[in-house]
Each structure stands twice: as C-alpha cells, then as structure tokens.
Amino acid sequence: MEKGKRIVHIVLIGLAYGYLGYKIATYDNYAGLAMQFRQAEWWQYVCLAVSVLLFPVNRLCEAWKWRFLVRGIEPMNMWEAQRQVYYGTIAGFVTPYKLGEYPGRAMLFKQTGQHWLTATCMGMIGGYAMTTVIVVFGLPAAIWWLKPDGSLLWSVALALMSATIAIFALPELMRHLRKRTWKSEQTRLLIDTMADLNYHDVAVLLGISLVRYAVFSLQLLLTLLFCGVKLDALSMTVCLPLYYLLITVTPNVPAAEVAVRGAWAVAIFERFGADISAAAVIATLVLWAINTILPLIVGSLVAYKRK
C-alpha cells in the first residue's frame, strides 16, 4: 500500500476514534442505560445477543450488494468486499452525510483512477436501492400512522406500485437523461452508470436491499424488546418501517446522528407512554452502537490486510 494511502488511512482511523470518544464522553443518559442492563431478564439478554450476532449478517448483505455493483470494475471475493465495506464505515463516520463511505471503499481497490469515481457512483446506486426499499415499506406505515382507520389494502397497493415504478422506470429514465449534455463530469458518469443497468440488475439490487432491510428491522425489534418495549404486532409493524423512513429522509451530520435517531424514537413511541418512549430512545442508542461502533472497530482492524 502506498505511503500516501497509508497516511490517509491512519488519519481517517484517528478521526473516527476521536469522534467516537467525543460521542461517548458527551452522552448524557448513562444512568438510564445502566438501569436497563440491570433490570433486564435473561430472555431480554438473548434478544440483545441475537441482535449483536445479526450485525455481521447486516454487513454481509451490504458486501454482497457492493460486490455485485463493482463486479465489472474490480472482481473480488466476499472477504475483500466485506473488507471494503467495513473500511467505508470509517470514511463515512467522519464525513458529513456519510459522503465518504463509497469513496472510502474504493480506496482499497488495487487500481483507482477512473475506476474510483465509477465505483463511487455504483455505491450511490446501491444506496438508492436501499432508500427505495425503505420508502416502499415506510410510506404505507406513515399513512397508517397518520390515519389508522384508513384502508391498509390501499397503502399496500401504493407500496407495490412504488416498487414497480422503481424497477421499470429508473433505467429508462437514465437512458433518456443520458442524451442531454452535462457540465459536471461526476453527474454524467453517474447517469451513464445507471443507464447501463438492466431490469435484472435493478431487481437484484432491490432484492439484496430487501434482505438487508429485513435484517436491520429484526435487529431493531430485538433491541426494543431488550429495552422493555412491548407492543402489539400491528404497532410494531407500523413503528419500525416508519422509524427507518424518518431517519432516512432527515438530513443530518455525524455530530447529530444519535440525537436525530433519539428524537424520532420519541416522536413515534410517545403515544404509547413516557416509559415506552424513553426505552425506545435507549434502544436506538444500543442499536447505533451495534451497527456503527462494531463495524468501525472491525474496519480499523482489516484496513491493511489484503487476501
């Protein structure tokens, strides 16, 4: 690995751990967190353990998607795909809106250059696929949340229609935009990359994103149970997709990420009582630690290894 890259890696890792230390030092609800751990029963610890065990499955799904996206740029095995995904977590952790995540992954390519920018565009496409799945499930949940007596069948039909549009309209739209002249080289490259996708590619990306969505939704459910949030099945079915929808569409920077997650947890769960909303806030913190701090640690350990 070139000296320049090594310096960048060291700086990124240093910034990530420095920021992590800041977040830990400034968190102001350790008393509630400690109380939850003291009061939890054995089955709640089982829920927490399963949620932690699902964290590598979560990242494996993302690595699967990343490997699929860049297969035409730099073929790699699953180990290398996971290594790049974990390292991208570090770069995303220290940049606004996680803008550095995909360029960070591409930094570990054997050859960079134009491939680096193309890979970044492909990563953005993977992010759009994940956002599509979150919206498809979150939109009906939002409708049901705002109007519980509305038609659930209509909400589901809206979700299916959105999924169909996402699958069949995106490639055709990009092919149309490709005919225009773009001043920005990055914009032109992104449109060209998306225009080269076929319907099978889009369906695969949405399928992988759906699997990952199921995994981190299960993680949230298990973490909520660990923290003592017990709701009926319908309420959980609505609250989980709604939560992920809201944190996805809310612009935020790393310094405010935990606060944004906690604020939306309060907004969603407060109708079930103050105790439930307080427990939900703790659950979002625990899940943030599982899916952000653990990948950060793994990423710093595997950054320099190439198999």
Question: Which role fits each region the language model picked out?
Answer:
Residues 91-95, 241-262:
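Transmembrane alpha-helix interface/packing and boundary motifs in multi-pass membrane proteins
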